[in-house]
């Protein structure tokens, strides 16, 4: 049996109209650094005192079926915005010549997505489709000499059995955002022109939780359960003025 190394693994993501209903059109293709998306079926031991001659409790029943995980991606000019929109809530895009400006704003109703996860190319039937995927947290960082990356924690409704492999057609202009591509600009009274930054890390916690209810092994639609939090840390060079 072949070993699944994960080479050439990637994602295809589409925004859903209705939570948990699969959409496979207008997909964004995203390269991966790592991914732990999976579905797990809990098995709970029955607690009654009826036991076989071994004296062990041998019976179990199905508990919750949980889908989700984390993924780490390189931030690129093309494709990464779909996940950022799912994390923040809303996005507007305007074109100016050959360039595009994307503005992401927080929204209470977070969009969900259908994620098709191709688990490498050295095994057959390695594509798994997750529905009802929502971003519970996001962390984005970049340091001098490196490339910008982001990690996302995903809560999903369910996934289908793995099926036929799919191929990637990454768009042109999807180069990785390297440290020399631009500056970090912050609003407010802080004068960023006087600061030389070595690195930054931006973290968003959407306070999403699974909603386990009677009548289903799957979560209901996760909703924001507390005040969302955004934190940012920067490392800068200091000098006397």
How would you label these PLM feature ranges?
Residues 1-241:
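Signature of extracytoplasmic/envelope-associated structural regions
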């Amino acid at each position: 049996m072949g070993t699944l190394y994960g080479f050439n693994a990637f994602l295809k993501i589409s925004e859903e109209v209705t939570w948990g209903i699969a959409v496979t059109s207008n997909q964004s293709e995203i390269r991966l650094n790592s991914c732990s998306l999976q579905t797990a079926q809990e098995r709970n031991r029955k607690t009654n005192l009826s036991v076989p001659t071994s004296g062990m409790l041998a019976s179990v029943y199905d508990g919750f079926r949980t889908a989700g995980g984390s993924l780490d991606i390189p931030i690129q000019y093309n494709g990464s915005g779909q996940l950022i929109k799912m994390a923040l809530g809303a996005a507007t895009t305007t074109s100016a010549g050959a360039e595009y400006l994307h503005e992401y704003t927080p929204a209470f109703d977070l969009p969900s997505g259908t994620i098709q996860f191709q688990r490498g190319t050295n095994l057959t039937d390695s594509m798994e489709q997750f529905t009802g995927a929502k971003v519970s947290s996001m962390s984005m960082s970049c340091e001098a000499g490196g490339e910008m990356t982001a990690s996302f924690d995903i809560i999903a409704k369910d996934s289908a059995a793995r099926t036929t492999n799919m191929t990637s057609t990454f768009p042109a202009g999807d180069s990785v955002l390297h440290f020399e591509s631009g500056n970090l600009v912050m609003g407010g009274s802080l004068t960023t022109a006087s600061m030389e930054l070595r690195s930054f890390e931006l973290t968003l916690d959407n306070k999403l939780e699974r909603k386990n209810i009677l009548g289903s092994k799957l979560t209901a639609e996760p909703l924001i359960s507390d005040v969302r939090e955004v934190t940012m840390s920067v490392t800068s060079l200091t000098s006397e003025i």
